[in-house]
């Protein structure tokens, strides 16, 4: 198991919270909660060691050219593909009311 932390510039925190995915399914679970204004914080707990660069690139692609809401995101991963990670994050953003 490996724990990774990332931070990105962000706007204002949303009012909502979201929990998407199921960690026990061999997939991943994503919890999105309002964060500190101006900061998006992501913590990833993953069963895949040595994947920090892959996670970093995934988040950089997702947030490039846009200002995400200020969130605290916790991801519990059990080997999900980058496409599934992005899908779960997009589902979470939709649930909290941010496009």
From Swiss-Prot:
Keywords: Cytoplasm, Phosphoprotein
Domain of life (superkingdom): Bacteria
Chief location category: cytoplasm
GO molecular function per UniProt: acyl carrier activity
NCBIfam families the UniProt entry points to: malonate_delta (TIGR03130), PRK01220.1 (NF002293)
Family named by the database record: Belongs to the MdcC family.
Record's protein name: Malonate decarboxylase acyl carrier protein
Species this protein is from: Pseudomonas savastanoi pv. phaseolicola (strain 1448A / Race 6)
């Amino acid at each position: 198991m490996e724990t990774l932390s990332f931070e990105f510039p962000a706007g204002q925190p949303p009012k909502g919270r979201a929990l998407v995915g199921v960690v026990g399914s061999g997939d991943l679970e994503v919890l999105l909660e309002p964060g500190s204004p101006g900061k998006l914080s992501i913590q990833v707990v993953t069963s895949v060691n040595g994947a920090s660069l892959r996670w970093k690139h995934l988040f950089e692609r997702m947030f490039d050219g846009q200002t995400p809401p200020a969130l605290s995101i916790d991801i519990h991963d059990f080997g999900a593909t980058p496409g599934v990670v992005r899908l779960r994050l997009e589902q979470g953003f939709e649930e909290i009311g941010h496009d």
